Amino acid sequence: MMPQLRDSGNHSTAPLDGRTRGEVDAFIRIFGIETEYGVSVTGADAPCDAGQTAMMMFQPIVAQARSTNTYIENGSRLYLDVGSHPEYATAEARDPMDALALDAAGELVMRDLAMDTQHRLREGHGRRAIVHVFKNNADSAGHSFGCHENYLVRRFVPLETIEHELLPFLITRQIFTGAGRVGGQGFQITQRADFLDEAVSSATTRSRPMVNTRDEPHADPDAFRRLHVIIGDSNRSQWATMMKLATTHLVLCVIEQAGREGRESGFARFAFADPGAANHAVSRDASGVGAVFDMADGDVIRGGAVAVQERYLAAVERFVEDHPEVGASLPRTDVHDVIAQWHEALEAFRSGDVDALADRVDWVCKKRLFDALQARTGHLPASRLEQLDMDYHDVANGTVYASLCRRGGMRTLLGRDAADRAVHMPPDDTRAALRGRFVREAKAKGARYSCDWTRLTLMSPHHSEMVLLDPFDFEESERFRQMMDMLA
């Protein structure tokens, strides 16, 4: 039985102002990615605890911000999560490409912290100590950590609708967004399937749901809710990161428009009888077409994840044709190109040419590499495959992924310059622009300050505070200019 969902009741029935009403009526969206990183040290003269190493990584942060929880110049959040996992949450983005740039910036931030820590570790633990920072979702000890996506959705979409209509899409999209994993049960196309135990929940630490329903919109609670997607892997592939955000956005547009018009979207018939079983089946079906799904309405869908994805894609394609204004919802991503690439990916599975996706899908790339090495050597121990798997995800000292990119084995959508720029510059069309400027100026002046997603607080040399409730609003208000003047 699926868990019952409830709103938190923290919103009123007050009428929305004109600007917010326009945002609700449009197809625009806010995107964000939260990534928990794994940490380990090899080559040291004495054992180095992962938690202590993570704390060492954050020593420069604590020295400057007096906390392991801070916001940086690009508007993103940097902090130590439960279990001493360094975590980076991207600033608000209006477009998947902006979210991708911020995500790539997070890799660079983590790499810099790791290399600084490595330099300091070698002074006391030997010159061969190496700090590894893994952008993946499972370690060799069986611990899991997450990559969570955030989507701002309209309040009028019931939580039950999200559960029944979006979850089958999220489960089956993993054929092109999965990062892949070598484990005790062989190769799986996802990293998280063995660790997710519920479909929907309001907790992420006590349980491991696929979708989290805590009502923390970080926006006007009368107008929006924040969809917190747990089911998803940490991607090295830039294409996979862009596609998971863009395709999910388009499916949400269909669901939201049906809600506006008071009708069914048609996606309810794709609900699985057992989402957990479906998730495991997808993860173990590298063909993409072999799994068989029992549906909640008693029907059976054959043809694997591809068959379900084709149904979603057909509905999205019709919707975009009928609502051309959806194209304007993403300022830097062409929705027609997204649809074309979605088609191309599914056709590769349908035709049996899965290797054609090795230059853009993480799990396909890794599996082809591992299969080639096995064929060349005759046999590689499982421990060596696991080592290569981890190296692929090591943003600090890994060589496998970087080598693939250099040789054209993995396509990139952004250059290093764009990632470098995103380390310091937030998107200019969300409130992150204001937060980023505030943080930059406060740090430059040595002022004491704090902030969160919706609030800026200046504590010295003067005290001032302001609320930034609208994530789409990047315009400098009189209040904001006054705060900047206090820092001048």
UniProtKB/Swiss-Prot annotation:
The gene is pafA. One of its GO terms (biological process) is proteasomal protein catabolic process. Disulfide bonds: none annotated. Catalyzes the covalent attachment of the prokaryotic ubiquitin-like protein modifier Pup to the proteasomal substrate proteins, thereby targeting them for proteasomal degradation. This tagging system is termed pupylation. The ligation reaction involves the side-chain carboxylate of the C-terminal glutamate of Pup and the side-chain amino group of a substrate lysine. This is Pup--protein ligase. Mg(2+) binds at E34, Y79, E87. Belongs to the Pup ligase/Pup deamidase family. Pup-conjugating enzyme subfamily. Its EC number is 6.3.1.19. One of its GO terms (molecular function) is ATP binding. The reaction mechanism probably proceeds via the activation of Pup by phosphorylation of its C-terminal glutamate, which is then subject to nucleophilic attack by the substrate lysine, resulting in an isopeptide bond and the release of phosphate as a good leaving group. It holds the Pfam family Pup_ligase. It catalyses: ATP + [prokaryotic ubiquitin-like protein]-L-glutamate + [protein]-L-lysine = ADP + phosphate + N(6)-([prokaryotic ubiquitin-like protein]-gamma-L-glutamyl)-[protein]-L-lysine. ATP binds at R77, T90, W453. The active site is at D81 (proton acceptor). PANTHER family: PUP DEAMIDASE/DEPUPYLASE, PUP--PROTEIN LIGASE. Pathway: Protein degradation; proteasomal Pup-dependent pathway; Protein modification; protein pupylation. Keywords: ATP-binding, Ligase, Magnesium, Metal-binding, Nucleotide-binding, Ubl conjugation pathway.
